[in-house]
Regions:
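Sec-dependent N-terminal signal peptides
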Residues: 4-13
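N-terminal leader/targeting and pre-domain segments
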Residues: 17-37, 121-127
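Short active-site neighborhood of thiol/selenol oxidoreductases, capturing the structured segment around
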Residues: 35-47
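The canonical Cys-X-X-Cys-His
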Residues: 44, 49-52, 94
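Thiol-based oxidoreductase modules, predominantly thioredoxin-like and allied folds used
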Residues: 44, 67-80
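Typically the conserved alpha-helix immediately C-terminal to a functionally engaged Cys/Sec
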Residues: 51-65
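Structural micro-motif
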Residues: 86-95
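Non-catalytic, surface beta->alpha helical segment in thiol-disulfide oxidoreductase systems
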Residues: 98-127
């Protein structure tokens, strides 16, 4: 049994599960986008979170579809100050702002249609 476990660990190294993403959130970008009344999608993630990995893949695709939207992300564990400012307590949280107003918040959503629908609903209300 011990040998089997060792073989499995070598076949599936833990870094293959890691999220490959950089923090793109900065206060300057966020405040400027708010001042310009832009729609901003913020995603909180963690390096070894599989749900986060699914969300990142969907949001990366959304960037191509929704060109006028600002997409920002940050690694939750290393950026507690950002999490505190945005009142985000958990990985997998996605928040959508319309200017300075929070228009949508979810946690753990991994269905593309649900995330796209949320973005489209905020776009419909665009002033």
């Amino acid at each position: 049994m011990k040998k089997l476990l060792i073989i499995i660990l070598f076949l599936f190294p833990s870094n293959s599960l890691a999220v490959e993403k950089n923090t793109t959130f900065t206060h300057e970008i966020f405040k400027k986008a708010q001042a310009e009344n832009k729609i901003i999608v913020i995603n909180s993630w963690n390096e070894f979170c599989l749900t986060c990995k699914k969300q990142i893949k969907i949001l990366d695709q959304a960037k191509d579809k929704f060109k006028d939207i600002i997409f920002l992300s940050y690694e939750q564990t290393e950026n507690k100050a950002i999490a505190d400012i945005l009142s985000i307590d958990y990985w997998t949280t996605i928040v959508i702002y319309k200017g300075k107003t929070e228009a949508y918040r979810s946690m753990g959503v991994t269905k593309k249609k649900d995330l796209y629908l949320a973005i489209e609903e905020v776009l419909k209300d665009k002033v």
